[in-house]
């Protein structure tokens, strides 16, 4: 049985490379002890051997010089993904094709070798290197199928929205112009057509994928594009805000069923706003008010 020389705290806290083990004054055979697990060749851990875990990913980045990218970077940035991509089989690492690298065929690593400008990479304090949010959005376009374009639009919406914080809205993670710039610099890459189509439909103001999907469904059903984050009563500073709405529109009522007007206090339709059902479940809003879709404050 291999003796268990205690690990220094810098190594015991997470994953480490064999070179880091040697630098700490421990021999290679220490990796054979039962308290350590092998993530892949050259990387071990005292915890669960998961290359996608933060410490495992950081160690693999240090070992290979790669950059966390694609689906792995999307998860790091908190981007919504279709179910088939939400649990990647391995850690996606990108290596700049102009740089000399080694050990890119490791177990648990999905390697990509492409041009990767330095301004498309985030350098984190723990040694982690991750593609920027805008570059990650573009890289996802090469992994999504044409019928999944709505997910790419939702990812774009997610990045350009001003997110809620305890003190109000914050600056967005990326801007539409930043997405456009990355797209222009990645011409000829897989996914460029899908990214271009998605970018044309990215909007500021959608706070969740369901809001994006609803907007797209309305447009594709032949309805006008709704506004996002609309005050129900623009004249009232304290007015609630709805996710989607048609400001000042009056829906024509059905000619085959009488419209029944009612007063409603439900969210999105303030008391005193006259609404009607046209027999098909479609709301009829009085001009000067907002016909609300979705719920506000998300």
Predicted regions and their residues:
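Short gly/ser-rich loop at a beta-strand->alpha-helix junction or flexible surface loop bordering the NTP-binding
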Residues: 1-191
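Surface segments flanking catalytic/ligand-binding clefts of nucleic-acid enzymes
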Residues: 20, 25, 163-298
